Amino acid sequence: MQNGLIYGLEDRPPLKDTLFAAMQHLLAIFVAIITPPLIISGTLGFDVETTSFLVSMSLFVSGIATFIQCKRFGGVGCGLLCVQGTSFSFISPIIMAGAIGGLPAIFGATMVGAFAEILVSRILKYAMKIITPLVSGIVVTLIGISLIKVGITSCGGGASAIENGTFGSYLNLGIAALVLLLIVLFNRSSNRYLRMGSIIIGIAIGYAVSFFCGMVDFGTMPEYSIFNVPVPFKYGVSFDISAIVAFAIVYVITAIEAYGDITANSLISGEPVEGQTFLKRAQGGILADGLNSFIAGALNSFPNSVFAQNNGMIQLTGVASRYVGYFIALFLVFLGFFPIVGVIFSFMPDPVLGGATLLMFGTVASAGVKIIASQQIDRKATLVIAISFSMGLGVELYPDILMQFPETIRNIFSSGITTGGLAAIISNMVIRIKE
């Protein structure tokens, strides 16, 4: 045993221990993987069949991505117990792209934008001088803030409730509040299993209550096949420059986040966190991050990223063996083959999802604030923060400020993440050079 670990990176635990550890990781990531496609589908008004397929492909692709990260093929992958899943960071750009060109534009931007992260993996040392922790913190905070609006909309009942006039009803808000409260209560439990499963338990209870309140009608459930067969480019692909730019900026930021997650994973796993071995591991992990997202776009799914919560699971279980990752990947791929998983969650009322995601998205914003607070907030940093938040939140709150510009420019800069992110990068470079 080293560094408090029961099983190290290259150890092969007995099958019983491997399966138990893999199931705990799965419990920690399952909801996080299926939430983005559910939010995106609800916002863009996709039908149950499409939503179900997107959920299934998110699970399937997350399994493939996790296997590539853990196995490490040549210079692709980090070779750690590193789990990948559908990223929350891209929800706002995806919704923007979907409004412009539907699923084809989303998948086109997912694939082309991924080359930004692939490029970062090749010039990692130089990229980190430009994308500093301050810049990353600002962008992560903007991502969280933009997502909170999406979460609140779901709490009120979503787009369908806005159309039928029930948005913000007592029932919708009550269900959302119940789910949020249950998650908080279970998360504070001294029982580690209740704590790990707090989100799933909260959603399950909220789903059951909403069913008895007449908010779920399984009578409209469509016919579906027993198995899902992944079909590359099922919905087609198109390329919109404004969507690609928005995606590329977030890809650059997620590359730096992945670097931090891989560093933490290496530290927890008792592996080096400096030197050539670590640098190759980090570059391979970020490269896999980008390549896996490219694969995701081709297989009708959304960008993937390394999941930080699994680092905590390694600490909790004392199991850092990357062979556990193979079983996590297998479970995810297996779940992705069965449409019933996606169908069941497709019928989940918006307030149930909203109650859970509101807390998740708030956590994203608070993580960004934490990154910013970890830096020295001097005069230069204050200026960068002020410029970035003013411009990012400005266009987010009042996008009509860009109404006189050409449509392509409007589409690019109407995203607070894009505008605020570019403002953070440019102002950070200019002010630093100036000084």
Predicted regions and their residues:
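Membrane-embedded helical hairpins/re-entrant loop segments and their flanking transmembrane helices
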Residues: L15, S41-G77, I249-R322
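Intrinsically disordered, low-complexity non-transmembrane regions of multi-pass membrane transporters
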Residues: M1-A21, T220-V231, L267-G284, I426-E435
